[in-house]
Amino acid sequence: MCKGLAGLPASCLRSAKDMKHRLGFLLQKSDSCEHNSSHSKKDKVVVCQRVSQEEVKKWAESLENLINHECGLAAFKAFLKSEYSEENIDFWISCEEYKKIKSPSKLSPKAKKIYNEFISVQATKEVNLDSCTREETSRNMLEPTITCFDEAQKKIFNLMEKDSYRRFLKSRFYLDLANPSNCGSEKQKGAKSSVDCASLLPQCA
């Protein structure tokens, strides 16, 4: 017959209490981890969770409008990544970041990093530049200034504008945002003022 807890030795009771304490701690830790994980996922999509339909339509007016909007840039980058050709937009972004450098001492190392990654013969993400622009940019590396990539950046922008930007506007990456009602959601059919960018375009996160 079961004698209950009173019949158990003191050492067994202590072990049982220890086990209960450990299990309680692990369960509490698990709940905490799940909460933090859920919170992190929400944080990731808050950047471009909603974008107005008016703004999405502006993306079709010019490449400049598209890539100067945070979610627009993310959508375009995701599209280029799907085509394995994201080096152009990566170069453009790097040039924009480079032009924001305030300290003159940081210009040279950053310029060399961009040059080695996108322009040199052995570049890991070589962009498609004509020989004249490539040579001019190479000369600029002797004494890097804040404008040393301007010509190369302009050429790559024009290249994207004439080619990949036009394909992007015909792709699902843009069309699902421009016409959310096509996704089959009845709620979205009535919501003309804005669209849930995070649900239609996970790559924005």
Curated annotation (Swiss-Prot):
Protein task: Inhibits signal transduction by increasing the GTPase activity of G protein alpha subunits thereby driving them into their inactive GDP-bound form. Activity on G(z)-alpha is inhibited by phosphorylation of the G-protein. Activity on G(z)-alpha and G(i)-alpha-1 is inhibited by palmitoylation of the G-protein.
GO biological process: negative regulation of signal transduction
Residue ranges annotated for the RGS domain, each copy included: 62-178
Lipid-carrying residues in chain (S-palmitoyl cysteine): 2, 12, 95
PTM comment: Palmitoylated on Cys-2 and/or Cys-12.
Gene designation per UniProt: RGS4
InterPro entries with a match to the protein in the record: RGS, RGS_RGS4, RGS_sf, RGS_subdom1/3, RGS_subdomain_2
Key words of the record: Lipoprotein, Palmitate, Phosphoprotein, Signal transduction inhibitor
Protein name, as recorded: Regulator of G-protein signaling 4
PANTHER family: REGULATOR OF G PROTEIN SIGNALING, REGULATOR OF G-PROTEIN SIGNALING 4
Stretch forming the signal peptide: none
Record Gene3D superfamilies: 1.10.196.10, Regulator of G-protein Signalling 4, domain 2 (1.10.167.10)
